[in-house]
A protein has these predicted regions:
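Conserved beta-propeller blade signature
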Residues: 56-58, 107-109, 172-173, 217-219, ...
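Beta-rich, blade/repeat-based domains predominating
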Residues: 42-53, 90-103, 116, 147-171, ...
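Blade-level signature of beta-propeller repeat domains, shared across WD40, Kelch, NHL, RCC1
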Residues: 305-334
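Blade-loop segments of beta-propeller domains
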Residues: 69-102
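Blade/loop signatures of beta-propeller domains
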Residues: 15-31
Length: 334
């Protein structure tokens, strides 16, 4: 072989080599900056991620201040090709996503924190959960929980929900992670049932209905307390797990749970919620400053600030990060 062409070929192979995270059966090839946005749309903080029954990937982001287009929900195919987007009304507050098959149709449960609006802070008139079709049509909207005894009737209690989970019977659990720290339970039609938590949590940022045992329970990412809490579906404490680092949310596939830790790593948990592996962990400790910098300063094979994660139907993992210019990574299982 011509030596020049051999060297060129070797260089080309090196250029496309991807960083690898994990080991053994939990080994993944990392594709950072996954997903090709259309002209005029720029990522803000990338928060939530979910997959529908056709394999399409949904991303919720706050929309960058420089972006001409303001759509906060973006849909891609499995190859990262843009399909559609909508949700300008949620710019600034776009946060948690949960996608659920109901009968013959998929529905998106979308959470708006109420942040990022004129006036600053949390604007509770925007804080909500919206159940919508995959085309963005609203089925129902749950706003300030006037029905709950834990919230003042004049609307003055801070309410800033972060994530949502759905029980097998359709009951909705909404985490008020940036507000009063309660978990609000509704039935499948959006009718209030109860609220619980409060001082029991410190930023219940994410949650998952855990059906891996005979008795389903609620797994709560008690973020500021650096722990996982397990509670019954009616709010009774069942146990806790320490040794996590700012846990954000959960997604489960075949008994394995992926949990984004805000402090620069992704964590895998087994059926007993014990740590199996940390992926892409950056131990330099500068993630809070790094998240504000250009993406050229992000480190390949390392996370900055994972905020959302989900498995796809093949066991690959999609990760969204809380960085000001947005970052979506696909971890391809190898």
């Amino acid at each position: 072989m011509n030596r020049r062409f051999f060297l060129l070929g070797t260089a080309a192979q090196a250029a496309v080599r991807r960083p690898v995270m994990g080991s053994g059966e939990h080994t993944y090839e990392a594709f950072h900056d996954w997903g090709r946005l259309p002209d005029g749309l720029s990522w803000g903080n990338t928060h939530g991620v979910a997959e529908d029954s056709e394999g399409r990937i949904y991303i919720a982001h706050t929309v960058h201040a420089s972006s001409e287009r303001k759509d906060s929900l973006v849909v891609f195919d499995q190859d990262g090709k843009y399909i559609r987007s909508w949700g300008a009304a949620f710019q600034g507050g776009a946060h948690g996503l949960h996608l659920r098959r109901e009968g013959r149709e998929d529905f998106l449960y979308f959470v708006d924190t109420g942040k990022g609006r004129p006036g600053g802070g949390v604007q509770v008139t925007y804080s909500c959960l919206v159940k919508m079709t995959l085309r963005g049509e609203t089925v129902f909207r749950l706003g300030y929980p006037f029905e709950s005894p834990d919230y003042k009737k004049d609307g003055s209690t801070k309410f800033s929900p972060t994530n949502v989970a759905i029980a097998p019977n359709g009951d909705i659990y909404l985490a008020d992670g940036y507000g009063a720290y309660n978990i609000l339970q509704y039935d499948s039609k959006g009718r209030f049932i109860r609220s619980f938590g409060g001082s029991q949590f410190a930023c219940p940022h994410g949650l998952m209905v855990d059906t891996r045992s005979a008795e389903p329970s609620l797994l709560v990412a008690d973020r500021t307390n650096n722990r996982l809490q397990r509670v019954s579906l009616d709010g009774r404490q069942l146990g806790s797990h320490n040794g996590v680092n700012l846990p954000c949310h959960f997604h489960e596939r075949r008994g394995l749970v992926v949990m984004p830790d805000l402090a620069a790593r992704l964590t895998l948990l087994d059926a007993s919620n014990q740590v199996i592996a940390h992926l892409g962990e950056d131990t330099t400790g500068d993630w809070q400053e790094l998240r504000k910098k250009p993406r050229t300063e992000f480190r390949a094979g390392k996370f900055v600030s994972p905020h959302g994660a989900c498995f796809d139907h093949d066991g690959n993992i999609f990760v969204t990060e809380w960085v000001e210019v947005g970052r979506v990574t696909k971890l391809r299982r190898v």
